[in-house]
Amino acid sequence: MSEKSVEAAAELSAKDLKEKKEKVEEKASRKERKKEVVEEEENGAEEEEEETAEDGEEEDEGEEEDEEEEEEDDEGPALKRAAEEEDEADPKRQKTENGASA
């Protein structure tokens, strides 16, 4: 009889260990998923662009567009200055462009 009780106790402890191991694995899995969600939120659009790009060409095109936008941003202040200089040279033109009558 004592052999049966020892075997039963061993089976129970093995089951308990297995259940505990599964719980620990589930908890680790949940932590990993939460970590991934946080990383996705932090990276946001960057990850989406990388995942949707199937080959390097599509990704390169996006970089070229970014460079063009940066160049346009750089030109913005220079164009504004040039327009202001023209307005100073021709005040009547400035008034008509702003909607006031000349």
Curated annotation (Swiss-Prot):
Ranges of biased composition (kind: Acidic residues): 38-76
PTM annotation (N-acetylserine): residues: 2
Ranges where the record places region Disordered: 1-102
Modified residues (N6-acetyllysine): 4, 15, 92
PTM-bearing positions, type Phosphoserine: 2, 5, 13
Keywords: Acetylation, Immunity, Phosphoprotein
GO terms under biological process: DNA replication; immune system process; negative regulation of apoptotic process; positive regulation of transcription by RNA polymerase II
Coiled coil: none
Extent of Basic and acidic residues compositional bias: 13-37
UniProt GO molecular function: histone binding
InterPro entries given in the database record: Pro/parathymosin (IPR004931)
Pfam family, one: Prothymosin
GO cellular-component term (any): nucleus
Modified residues (Phosphothreonine): 52
Chain's role: Parathymosin may mediate immune function by blocking the effect of prothymosin alpha which confers resistance to certain opportunistic infections.
Protein name: Parathymosin
Organism for this UniProt entry: Homo sapiens (Human)
